[in-house]
Design a protein with these regions (language model features):
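Glycine-centered tight beta-turn/hairpin loop motif at sheet-sheet or coil-to-beta transitions
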Residues: 32, 53-55, 74-78, 96-100
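Short hydrophobic/aromatic-rich beta-strand segments that constitute the beta-sheet cores
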Residues: 48-50, 71-72, 81, 95, ...
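Low-complexity or membrane-interfacial segments used for flexible interactions
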Residues: 1-36, 41-43, 87-91, 96-171
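Helix-adjacent hinge/juxtasegments
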Residues: 61-90
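Acidic, aromatic-enriched beta-alpha/helix-loop junctions
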Residues: 40-70
Length: 171
């Protein structure tokens, strides 16, 4: 199992830093070393950047008026992610090997799970209790290649953003 901590990069940025392991705060994460990835979110797009060499691994662009579908390009391929349903906060995506995954979000829990097409839990995201700088902790249950990890990280960030917006709008 692999564990990652996700933190806001700063107070006035939409970027998220991804560190290995679970950390109490951003300072302890930074003391242990450089972030592995940075997820940048813009109004109509997202990027996953490997921090060690500033290489963009995955670029996503929202499609349509409602922004409920995203085209994702990276690793020499393109795929799509889309909202799991009209009134649902979860998202689905197809990886670069044509396997389907779904983020399942519970409105009564501070965590959500990523399942594969067979219903197996592949990853779990648990939101931080105090949501000042830490978004939460992502646990990836089994070894995955970097392409699938990139898709997991970006779609987890999309779901986190949607859940946050839903809470702020009272939905």
């Amino acid at each position: 199992m692999s564990v990652y901590s996700l933190y806001h990069k700063g107070a006035f940025t939409r970027s998220t830093l991804v560190f290995p392991n679970d950390h109490k705060n951003l300072t302890s994460a930074q003391d242990e070393g450089q972030a592995l990835y940075e997820i940048t979110r813009h109004t109509c797009s997202m990027e996953l950047i490997r921090c060690a060499n500033a290489q963009t691994l995955l670029a996503g662009k929202y499609e349509g008026f409602t922004s409920r579908t995203m085209s994702l390009t990276g690793f020499g391929m393109t795929t799509k992610a889309k909202q799991a349903g009209v009134w649902k906060l979860g998202w689905k995506f197809i990886d670069f090997s044509s396997n389907e995954f779904t983020w399942r979000v519970s409105t009564t829990s501070s965590s959500w799970t990523l399942t594969d097409q067979g219903g197996r839990v592949v990853a779990k995201f648990t939101r931080a209790r105090l949501r000042i700088s830490k978004l939460g902790v992502l646990e990836v249950m089994e070894r995955v290649d970097e392409a699938l990890l990139a898709l997991i990280l970006v779609t987890c960030k999309i779901v986190h953003h949607d859940v946050q917006e839903s809470e702020q709008s009272g939905g």
